[in-house]
């Protein structure tokens, strides 16, 4: 109630651990679902009624290209982020008549503490980071500075007729071929 009237919501929570699927325990599943999916659901429940009452707004959910291309050792994370994509598209459709534009940004491998933390849980951290770099057609990890522009666009009036879209920002990782 103290935050005023929300016009933009950016859900950018993320948590991951490198773990081959056959070694994944239910506790890890529950932890990742809680942060990566349930956290977004909770934010939507808090913010959207106020946003709708104020005449609409913009929601940008940050998922991951791991949900779109798969990534060995990230089955639970990919499932969470794929769930966020499906949830987002459905909610975008439900809220389109309420002047709420809801879109998803899917980052590729990004040089952040999150990725470094994931790498540290792998048997060979540097080899994993190199594999991420090599998977990207631009042959580099994204930098945090690669994302504010698309987020700002989707939060702006220039995006008043953009909703339900999933936008990859990954140096071409999801290109066909």
Residue ranges and their predicted role:
Residues 44, 80, 88:
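Active-site helix of classical SDR
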């Amino acid at each position: 109630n103290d935050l005023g009237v929300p016009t933009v919501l950016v859900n950018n929570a993320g948590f991951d651990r490198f773990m081959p699927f056959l070694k994944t325990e239910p506790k890890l599943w529950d932890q990742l679902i809680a942060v990566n999916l349930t956290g977004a659901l909770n934010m939507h429940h808090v913010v959207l009624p106020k946003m709708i009452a104020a005449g609409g707004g913009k929601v940008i959910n940050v998922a991951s290209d791991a949900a779109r291309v798969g990534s060995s050792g990230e089955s639970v994370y990919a499932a969470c982020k794929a769930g966020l994509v499906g949830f987002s598209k459905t909610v975008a459709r439900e809220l389109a008549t309420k002047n709420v534009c809801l879109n998803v940004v899917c980052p590729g491998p990004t040089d952040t503490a999150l990725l470094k933390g994931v790498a540290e849980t792998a048997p060979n951290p540097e080899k994993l980071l190199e594999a991420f770099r090599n998977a990207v057609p631009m042959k580099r990890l994204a930098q945090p500075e690669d994302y504010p522009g698309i987020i700002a666009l989707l939060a702006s009036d220039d995006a008043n007729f953009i909703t339900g879209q999933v936008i990859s920002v990954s140096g071409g990782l999801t290109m066909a071929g």
